[in-house]
Amino acid sequence: MSTPGDFSLSPFILGGAVDPRSMSQLGNICHADYMSTSTESQERSLNNPNDTHPEIVNVVSTFQLGVKLELRKIVQKARNAEYNPKRFAGAIMRISSPKSTALIFQTGKIVCTGTRSIEESKIASKKYAKIIKKIGYPIHYSNFNVQNIVGSCDVKFQIALRTLVDSYLAFCQYEPEVFPGLVYRMASPKVTLLVFSTGKVVLTGAKDEESLNLAYKNIYPILLANRKEDISNQ
């Protein structure tokens, strides 16, 4: 259902089960981002989590229109919309401001993904509703809910993933032959983190910014204790 390089439609981004086999592209991006980080910024943030924080890279929300939809009619009359039922059960629509993608289902349920804040997601959802209303549907916009907030950050030091998984086995999944990142499932807040040896961290599953930031605050000392240089000197 997703296109190459489009993580916004993957089960990971939508808040589903994390499958490392589907995340190899994300691992490559994380590695490239880390290599572009300067040594000066790495030293500045070390030992001080306040210098770094998760940046929201995607908000996934859902809402209802309260009416059955004819998806072929919608894609015929709307711009930037497509529908291929052999590939995916819903129609896909995109708008540029705020930049986002909507997955539109016959039931009237819509998934909005790709925005960088909850407020942007609300604005985008109402724009999609307005587009469908103009096509001729007597919509009733309701039940806007944030399903998943995805954040990304860089702790600016390398991490010994094997040591980390040995210390926190109950929370970790690590299959380096399949995927270079470690999957850490935090119990409270209920957030899943992808941790890379480069220091890149992706957080998913949060329903609000407070949970996203708290998850990072909780994981930072664990990552610092498993800093690769510190482990090698013991």
Swiss-Prot record:
Pfam assignment, any one: TBP
Keyword S-adenosyl-L-methionine in annotation: no
Sequence ranges of the Sequence repeats: 52-136, 142-223
Cellular component GO terms held in the UniProt record: transcription factor TFIID complex
GO molecular function: DNA binding; RNA polymerase II general transcription initiation factor activity
One of the GO BP terms on file: positive regulation of transcription initiation by RNA polymerase II
Subcellular location: Nucleus
Keywords recorded for this protein, A-Z: DNA-binding, Nucleus, Repeat, Transcription, Transcription regulation
Known function: General transcription factor that functions at the core of the DNA-binding multiprotein factor TFIID. Binding of TFIID to the TATA box is the initial transcriptional step of the pre-initiation complex (PIC), playing a role in the activation of eukaryotic genes transcribed by RNA polymerase II.
HAMAP family given in the database record: TATA_bind_prot_arch
Subunit text: Belongs to the TFIID complex together with the TBP-associated factors (TAFs). Binds DNA as monomer.
Record-stated family: Belongs to the TBP family.
Protein name: TATA-box-binding protein 1
Gene source species: Entamoeba histolytica (strain ATCC 30459 / HM-1:IMSS / ABRM)
Source species taxonomy: Eukaryota, Amoebozoa, Evosea, Archamoebae, Mastigamoebida
Gene (name only): TBP
